[in-house]
Amino acid sequence: MSGEQVATGLYWDPDTWQLARAAYVADLDHDPDCPTGFLWWLHRTIELHVARGASGRAALGVAPQTVRSVGRGFNRHHPLKVSTRAALEQALLDDRVEHGRVLSRSAWVHEAVTVAVARSRDRLGRDLDLVPGRLPNRPVRSGVG
């Protein structure tokens, strides 16, 4: 990834983290526009959610992120493009001003990922397969298209 980046700390609950990874891998084979890296997939997920606008995001009715038990989640720092981070921050403001939705950055990304996971599951036509271990650095893609 080129250009300026800003480290962005996000809280992940283990279930959402695993589903995000599974959606990324499924999208590699079933979405011709899927980027070939998880970080780029996360960028696209955020940018698509921004593009829905505050009303579109509110209409989705995604259940808020819940902490199921203390100590289960974890923080990760993701190097986001400055433009993506700025768009995310503006979306947070728009959601609060236009719809009274007060979300943390992590909760907002959780919402974006939840929608991306559902779309990936729809493309696949079944539940997503969880990915054990580390994601591949340079994944082989199927002939999507």
Predicted regions, residues:
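Short Lys/Arg-rich basic patches
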Residues: 1-24, 39, 58-92, 106, ...
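Conserved aromatic-histidine-acidic binding/catalytic patches
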Residues: 8, 34, 76, 97, ...
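Alpha-helix C-capping/helix-to-loop hinge sites
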Residues: 23-31, 91-99
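Short, basic amphipathic alpha-helical segments that act as recognition/interaction helices
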Residues: 30-60, 100-130
